[in-house]
């Protein structure tokens, strides 16, 4: 397989892992405070990431990379987890998940601004069409819409797109898993003490589903998923592979339906087919 194909495969695996993030977060915030969930998942992942960096004896990033790593940390370690956790206090995960379809545009825009990519104009047409399909589906599907919850989700998309694009640019120099690992380690001096500060008064009231969800978002959403995702973006291009994010809402909706028993209508099938067509077309015109 060539480099581009490998990029799409790695990106797809990353999307599958990320698809479980919002359903897991929805379960977690039923028992955990959003602030504790955010800092604790980052602290757990940061400790593990630091261990990996030591075991594999990775060199420290150059000083010129520190600002970019802080941008990644702001976007994907702190901003996105916190904003989505806050949003899921106001809307269902099924409603929140469809906003993830707007991530490709945010990632592509920041890829142009920060990564120097220049996709063809037709790419933007299909990218916008796919995102509009997802946004339209979100409005039609409803599911407990809240203006505040929607605002949190939109803000999370912006900061996450920035973090994705910045991380993909860095991964070409530092390596894919090294980027998120260093971002987590840089966040650790803040996240670790805050996780103790926001620790629940009593753990007896915390259910097993919430604990398992905390483990999932800490290990998979914060670390393992990014290993595949950043590798995919670096190999296949930020704008091109980023379009796979359009599929994430529909994998997530399936999980929300199965795990959380949230209602998902049959209109999902038609929208999913249309979005996949947009992904295929955007891929063709990405470069």
Swiss-Prot record:
Gene of origin?
Answer: ydeK
An example of a Pfam family matching this protein is EamA
Family the entry assigns: Belongs to the EamA transporter family.
Q: What is the lineage of its organism?
A: Bacteria, Bacillati, Bacillota, Bacilli, Bacillales
EamA domain: residues covered: 16-139, 158-284
Q: What is its main location?
A: membrane
The protein's name in its UniProt record: Uncharacterized transporter YdeK
Instruction: Extract the InterPro entries matched here.
Output: AA-Vitamin_Transporters, EamA_dom
Q: Where are its TM segments located?
A: 4-24, 36-56, 66-86, 93-113, 122-142, 148-168, 179-199, 208-228, 237-259, 264-286
User: Which of UniProt's keywords are assigned here?
Assistant: Cell membrane, Membrane, Repeat, Transmembrane, Transmembrane helix, Transport
Q: Does the keyword Zinc-finger apply?
A: no
| Gene Ontology CC entries for this record | plasma membrane
Q: Which SUPFAM superfamilies does UniProt cross-reference here?
A: Multidrug resistance efflux transporter EmrE
Q: How does it sit in the membrane?
A: Multi-pass membrane protein
Q: Where in the cell is it found?
A: Cell membrane
């Amino acid at each position: 397989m060539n480099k581009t194909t490998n990029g799409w495969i790695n990106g797809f695996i990353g999307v599958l892992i990320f698809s479980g993030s919002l359903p897991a977060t929805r379960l977690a915030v039923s028992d955990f405070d959003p602030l504790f969930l955010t800092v604790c998942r980052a602290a757990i992942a940061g400790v593990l990431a630091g261990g990996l960096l030591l075991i594999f004896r990775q060199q420290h990033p150059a000083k010129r990379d520190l600002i970019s790593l802080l941008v990644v940390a702001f976007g994907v370690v702190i901003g996105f987890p916190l904003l989505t956790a806050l949003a899921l206090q106001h809307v269902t995960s099924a409603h929140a998940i469809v906003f993830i379809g707007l991530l490709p545009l945010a990632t592509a825009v920041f890829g142009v601004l920060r990564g120097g990519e220049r996709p063809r104009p037709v790419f933007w047409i299909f990218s916008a069409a796919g995102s509009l399909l997802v946004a339209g589906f979100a409005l039609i599907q409803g599911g407990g819409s809240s203006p505040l919850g929607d605002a949190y989700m939109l803000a999370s998309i912006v900061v996450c797109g920035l973090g994705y694009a910045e991380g993909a640019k860095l991964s070409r120099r530092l390596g894919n898993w090294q980027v998120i690992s260093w971002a987590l380690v840089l966040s650790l001096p803040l996240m670790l003490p805050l996780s103790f500060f926001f620790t629940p008064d009593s753990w007896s009231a915390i259910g097993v589903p919430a604990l398992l969800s905390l483990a999932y978002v800490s290990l998979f959403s914060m670390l393992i998923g990014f290993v595949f995702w950043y590798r995919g973006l670096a190999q296949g291009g930020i704008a091109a592979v980023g379009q796979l994010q359009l599929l994430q809402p529909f994998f997530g909706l399936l999980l929300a339906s199965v795990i959380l028993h949230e209602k998902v209508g049959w209109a999902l099938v038609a929208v999913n087919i249309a979005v996949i067509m947009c992904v295929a077309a955007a891929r063709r015109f990405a470069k």
